[in-house]
């Protein structure tokens, strides 16, 4: 319901205005003061010896940051660089922090997105509630670049390159601060970053167009690959920042979806609640992010759909050149 207030001008927004407006003003004041304290030197920030690239946004919710992180890691790896990824590890509870992921780390330890990134890229991935601690651990691994998944507002960590990922269709909603609107920072922040990435929709001036390109569906148990359109009576579910984006992708792929179910982002699934969805169809299809949480109890009729970030070739080269210049 809160997203309907933020993005759809729902009438409840007007009813709740007297309650939410003061809270939004308080959020804005705290966020602005925190940023000012770090930038003025009143609070100490950490400067890494390794170039730090931040991929974040100015709104709450899922905008497509993780596919951008994966793309950056893979592109830099293809040029021979060793890349590390730092994350807060939201949704996980590690035995200690900072925590360096291994091939067998599960989402309940590190959170779902770090596991996805580790499995996709084989990069060094570290998590810690204080991101600078994760960065310090990655420095010890001898990485050439560190990419932070989210953390644009984590001013305790200095950075060399900043990306803001924008949902090209929902944009910035009603342009109010949390909780009345989706903003973590004001839209004026857009003018101070290195790259604005527009995920879907029509990119505005100075924005780089990005598309999420789906590949074949992959079976969670067997690893078999099949076109989505060849799967029948699908039940689709997603526990991501904006589930309708996933359902729309399936529709564009002409998937035979008979039921959809959205869950909150980073949800820790119980086997029974996913198994219950099977009553609506013959097979399940989910996002790659959800698949890492369902892998341990998956059934042979469960599939996931990976997506890859794609950019115009010229823009992709500009992005990589600017990052590599920092290293040189």
Swiss-Prot record:
Keyword Oxidoreductase carried by entry: no
Keyword line: ATP-binding, Kinase, Lipid A biosynthesis, Lipid biosynthesis, Lipid metabolism, Nucleotide-binding, Transferase
Protein name from the UniProt record: Tetraacyldisaccharide 4'-kinase
GO BP terms in the entry: lipid A biosynthetic process; lipopolysaccharide core region biosynthetic process
EC assignment: 2.7.1.130
Keyword Repeat in record: no
Catalytically driven reaction(s): a lipid A disaccharide + ATP = a lipid IVA + ADP + H(+)
Organism: Aliivibrio fischeri (strain MJ11)
Protein encoded by which gene: lpxK
GO molecular function per UniProt: ATP binding; tetraacyldisaccharide 4'-kinase activity
Function: Transfers the gamma-phosphate of ATP to the 4'-position of a tetraacyldisaccharide 1-phosphate intermediate (termed DS-1-P) to form tetraacyldisaccharide 1,4'-bis-phosphate (lipid IVA).
PANTHER family: TETRAACYLDISACCHARIDE 4'-KINASE, TETRAACYLDISACCHARIDE 4'-KINASE, MITOCHONDRIAL-RELATED
């Amino acid at each position: 319901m809160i997203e309907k207030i933020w993005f759809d001008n729902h009438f409840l927004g007007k009813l709740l205005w007297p309650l939410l407006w003061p809270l939004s003003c308080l959020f804005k004041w705290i966020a602005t003061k925190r940023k000012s304290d770090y930038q003025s030197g009143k609070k100490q920030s950490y400067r890494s010896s390794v170039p730090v690239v931040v991929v974040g946004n100015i709104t709450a919710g899922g905008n497509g940051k993780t596919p951008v992180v994966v793309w950056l890691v893979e592109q830099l790896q293809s040029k021979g660089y060793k890349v590390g990824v730092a994350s807060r590890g939201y949704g996980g509870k590690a035995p200690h922090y900072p925590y360096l992921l291994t091939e067998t780390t599960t989402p309940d330890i590190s959170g779902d997105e770090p596991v996805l990134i580790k499995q996709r890229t084989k990069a060094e991935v570290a998590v810690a509630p204080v991101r600078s601690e994760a960065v310090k651990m990655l420095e010890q691994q001898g990485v050439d670049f560190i990419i932070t998944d989210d953390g644009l507002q984590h001013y305790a960590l200095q950075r060399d390159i900043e990306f803001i990922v924008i949902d090209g269709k929902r944009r910035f909603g009603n342009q109010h601060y949390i909780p009345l609107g989706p903003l973590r920072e004001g839209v004026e922040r857009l003018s101070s970053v290195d790259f604005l990435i527009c995920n879907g929709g029509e990119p505005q001036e100075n924005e780089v167009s990005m598309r999420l390109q789906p590949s074949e569906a992959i079976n969670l148990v067997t690893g078999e690959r099949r076109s989505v359109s060849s799967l029948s009576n699908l039940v689709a579910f997603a526990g991501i920042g904006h589930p309708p984006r996933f359902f729309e992708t399936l529709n564009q792929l002409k998937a035979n979806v008979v039921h959809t179910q959205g869950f909150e982002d980073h949800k820790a699934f119980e086997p029974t609640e996913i198994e219950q969805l099977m009553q609506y169809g013959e097979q399940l299809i989910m996002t790659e992010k959800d698949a890492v949480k369902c892998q341990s109890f998956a059934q042979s009729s469960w599939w996931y759909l990976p997506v890859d970030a794609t950019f115009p070739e010229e823009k992709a080269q500009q992005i990589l050149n600017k990052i590599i210049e920092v290293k040189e």
